[in-house]
C-alpha cells in the first residue's frame, strides 16, 4: 500500500468516526502497517495541507487524540444549516466548579464541596448536560466515591489541546488577593 493511500485511509476513518481518535487506534485500524511515528507524520501532513489550503475541514489535536471538524472560520455558515444546541450560559457557581475540576482532577464531589463550601449536585448535573465533565471511575475507599474529570468538549470550548495549556493557578490567587 502506498503512503499516500494510507494518508487518505486515515482521513476517511477520521471523517467517518467523527470523534477524537488516538494514533494507537488508527494504527490498529490500518493493521499496523506503519509505526505510530509514521502515522503521526501523516496526521501532521494532513493538518498542514488543510491549514495551507484554508479548507473548510481541519484536524485538531486534543490531548493525545486527533479529530476532524469544521474550520471555525466558517462557523457562521454552518450555523445556518445546523440547529445549534440550546445551551444555557453557565452560572458563576458552575464556572467555579468547572475550574476546580479542571485544576484538581481527578476529584470527588466531596472534595469539590469542601473547596466551595456548598453542595454541588445541580452544578455537576449542568456540567454533565453540557458534556464538560465525565465520570472517570471510583476511588478505592469507603463509599467508593465517583471521581470527575473534564472532557475533550471542555478542551474544545477553551480552544486548547491539553490541560497543560491552562494558565497557572497562582495567577488567579494573586488576582483574588489583590481584589
Curated annotation (Swiss-Prot):
Signal peptide: none annotated. It holds the Pfam family SMC_ScpB. GO terms for biological process: cell division; chromosome separation; DNA replication. Keywords: Cell cycle, Cell division, Chromosome partition, Cytoplasm. It is found in: Cytoplasm. Its main location: cytoplasm. It comes from the Bacteria. SUPFAM superfamilies: Winged helix' DNA-binding domain. GO terms for cellular component: cytoplasm. The keyword Cytoplasm applies. PANTHER family: SEGREGATION AND CONDENSATION PROTEIN B (PTHR34298:SF2). HAMAP family: ScpB. Belongs to the ScpB family. Participates in chromosomal partition during cell division. May act via the formation of a condensin-like complex containing Smc and ScpA that pull DNA away from mid-cell into both cell halves. Homodimer. Homodimerization may be required to stabilize the binding of ScpA to the Smc head domains. Component of a cohesin-like complex composed of ScpA, ScpB and the Smc homodimer, in which ScpA and ScpB bind to the head domain of Smc. The presence of the three proteins is required for the association of the complex with DNA. This is Segregation and condensation protein B. It comes from Clostridioides difficile (strain 630) (Peptoclostridium difficile). The gene is scpB.
Amino acid at each position: 500500500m502506498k503512503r499516500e493511500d494510507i494518508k487518505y485511509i486515515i482521513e476517511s476513518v477520521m471523517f467517518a468516526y467523527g470523534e477524537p481518535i488516538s494514533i494507537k487506534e488508527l494504527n490498529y485500524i490500518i493493521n499496523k502497517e506503519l509505526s505510530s511515528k509514521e502515522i503521526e507524520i501523516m496526521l501532521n501532513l494532513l493538518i498542514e495541507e488543510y491549514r495551507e489550503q484554508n479548507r473548510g475541514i481541519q484536524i485538531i489535536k486534543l490531548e493525545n487524540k486527533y479529530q476532524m471538524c469544521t474550520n471555525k472560520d466558517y462557523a457562521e455558515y454552518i450555523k445556518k444549516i445546523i440547529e445549534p444546541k440550546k445551551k444555557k450560559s453557565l452560572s458563576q457557581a458552575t464556572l467555579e466548579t468547572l475550574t476546580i475540576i479542571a485544576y484538581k482532577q481527578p476529584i470527588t464531589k466531596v472534595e469539590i464541596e469542601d473547596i466551595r463550601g456548598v453542595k454541588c449536585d445541580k452544578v455537576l448535573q449542568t456540567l454533565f448536560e453540557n458534556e464538560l465533565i465525565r465520570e472517570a471511575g471510583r476511588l478505592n475507599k469507603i463509599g467508593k466515591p465517583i471521581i470527575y474529570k473534564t472532557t475533550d468538549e471542555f478542551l474544545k470550548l477553551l480552544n486548547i489541546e491539553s490541560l497543560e495549556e491552562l494558565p497557572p493557578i497562582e495567577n488567579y490567587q494573586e488576582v483574588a488577593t489583590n481584589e
